[in-house]
Curated annotation (Swiss-Prot):
Name recorded for this polypeptide: GMP synthase [glutamine-hydrolyzing]
Domain Glutamine amidotransferase type-1: 8-207
Catalytic activity: XMP + L-glutamine + ATP + H2O = GMP + L-glutamate + AMP + diphosphate + 2 H(+)
Keyword Ligase in record: yes
PANTHER family: GMP SYNTHASE [GLUTAMINE-HYDROLYZING], GMP SYNTHASE-RELATED
Enzyme class: ligase
Species of origin: Shewanella loihica (strain ATCC BAA-1088 / PV-4)
EC number: 6.3.5.2
Amino acid sequence: MSNIHDHKILILDFGSQYTQLIARRIREIGVYCELWAWDVSEEQIKAFAPNGIILAGGPESVTADNSPRAPEYVFNAGVPVLGICYGMQTMSEQLGGKVIQGVGEGEFGYAQVEVQAASELFKSIEDAVSDSGKALLDVWMSHGDKVSEIPEGFVTVAKTDTCPYAAMANEEKRFYGVQFHPEVTHTRQGKRMLEHFALDICQCEANWKPSSIIEDAVARIKEQVGDDEVILGLSGGVDSSVVAMLLHRAIGSKLTCVFVDNGLLRLNEADQVLEMFGDHFGLNIVHVDAESRFLDALAGEAEPEAKRKIIGKVFVDIFDEESRKCVNAKWLAQGTIYPDVIESAGSATGKAHVIKSHHNVGGLPDDMELGLVEPLRELFKDEVRKIGLELGLPYNMLYRHPFPGPGLGVRVLGEVKKEYCDLLRRADAIFIEELHKADLYNKVSQAFTVFLPVRSVGVMGDGRKYDWVVSLRAVETIDFMTAHWAHLPYDFLGRVSNRIINEIDGISRVVYDISGKPPATIEWE
């Protein structure tokens, strides 16, 4: 079987918001790829030895001084190159074509391009046919500048009414440019275009798949740690859970998982983690019940950022104490994933990205003197979930809504107290249970309950009560950068409210948060 890294695509990032999406689409096709800065050196490209190169989009203008350019070696490496949006423009300009600055006539949003010439990139692809019999493609545009003259050796492959060069190709050199974004779902045939590029034009094999990734990760863990022991902070979240399963498969009993119950988890979550990983999967777990330690440290603190720092510090202190008890451990495992290791760098434009050599997401002490094992550092979140399923983890755990690292510590507004956490846990469990029962859970991106430290008058039977208020929050979003509040049915919200107030002594009122992001954030703190 081929090594899963043998066939690969290099994506050069010029700062587009869609660049990581390109990488995810190539991975979904089954081909390994990496995302690098646009100003990468010739030596680095040669060492990586890609089967093809993609020049991604970006916010700069090719017509501006000091705007980013692809390394000249890209066009001399003898491999296919695909330029997307800005990538097409810089390809055209660098190879002798011309780009003009857009003046109020850019294309933003849906467009339909008409195919003008046959190309390997668009082979057997069409969404409709024009009156003249030419293929039409529904695409997503986002550009101001445009190519006004294509380089020598290129032909026009597609156009729109306002963009005469919506796609271009030099089939002999296997250079292609598209002014639209094939990586977004609005470009209906975008995935097939990227498949043509990666599989047919670059001739990559599609062996980047969950079973192969697991096999490769297990082999690399064994090679890295040998017979040494490894410790892992297991939270029950997606990343640490998948790391635990990979390490368990690779080294078995030489893995020790430290599970810290901070008293800020969801209802019965600690028991569920211990039962699944300890009883069901047979992992070696050290359970630390630290609820009182966290709550004592949080006492009297109401400021959100201060609460986060306290929770983080107490966790680090506890993990440090427990790890030192594992005297034979030589390695620390972490759930670092690929987006974690991409950070902005100070290039000429400030738009490049670099790969960190090390990303200690836990903020653990430097004097621990442990080697670092990061088996997920090549993977996007969706890939982590897929290999989690392959490893036997339950779907409902892997695809749960996001839960903040500080847990209920930032969903109890103001000072965190045990009473508040206990009430919030039960209210949140009712909300989530009802979402599942109504088949609404997977129709919203995130849903949770917030405890408000205010009392409100209520009526129960013949008596009045003066108890706490909770807010329900549900949002719909694609990327969590912006979000709309979810328009849940009124009868559903009424049912949730009635259950919370009737079943939980201590809550007298339930409200629903109808704030979008922006101006509000998704979490309240």
